[in-house]
Amino acid sequence: MNRFLLTVLALSLQLQLLGQMLPLSDHYVYNALAINPAFAGSEEALSATIFYRNQWVGFKDAPKSQMLSVHAPVFNDRIGLGLLIENNTVGIFKETNFLGNYSYRMELRDGKLSFGLAFGATVYNNGWNELDATDPNDYQLMNNPTSAVLPAISLGTYYYTKKYFIGFSLPLLLSHSLNQSTGKYELENSFSGYNYFLTGGYEFSISPMITFTPSMLVKYHPQNAIQIDYNTLFGLKDKVWVGLSYRSQDILVAMIQCQLNYQFRISYSYDFNMSSMGKYMGGSHEIVLNYVFRYNRKVIGPREF
């Protein structure tokens, strides 16, 4: 029954818009390339991140995400280049994004302003042939392609200093719909189909050893309700951080981060579903590993938050 319900839900969403499995991450501050291409190069060194998310633990065929990103500043730090590979699975649906990221960066007052573009492809696969259909000759199943390669584009801007950041982006702004008569996917490009992301945060120094960093992620789609992530993070000696987040869908998130040395950071979070569906869906695990090569403490970045 769980598999059936999830498949029906995913199917209804996919028939409306394809290629729009937007990344969901508790650690968007340190994994920002997933939602904003202007983040490329902002670590001021070659940076590699591995991300894994297991959503709704205990719910069969629930969403799972894996991600690998690499980015660095080049050409006198004016340009940021990056590569993002992201895989999302929901039930019988699988989507893999391959994106090359480019950012143009300029110094502005005590920080840097960046404009970014990501371009690549989305490889979409479904498992229609895995479904046990009552009628194996059902037209909807027979006329749906099992795979497709679709263009993908993201845009964004990002400003950051050692103490605060603000960003705006349109991730994966192209959408696609399935033409039932031809059995092919068609490109749709409309402002009403865009997702708008706004992020911001500031690090306060409570004492020489303790910091407090509130941040926020606002997601807006013209056809959906606004979703907001409110985040708080307390840091100790720039080595360990603990925090809580609240997502405006009755989701409470507990997180911890450890800076093992100047280059290696590990982050973990667990989502508690506080809604009436929480007892059926379970929580979600997320882990992020980040390694920065040739770290330089004297440049405007890396950010201290």
Describe these PLM feature segments:
Residues 4-13:
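Sec-dependent N-terminal signal peptides
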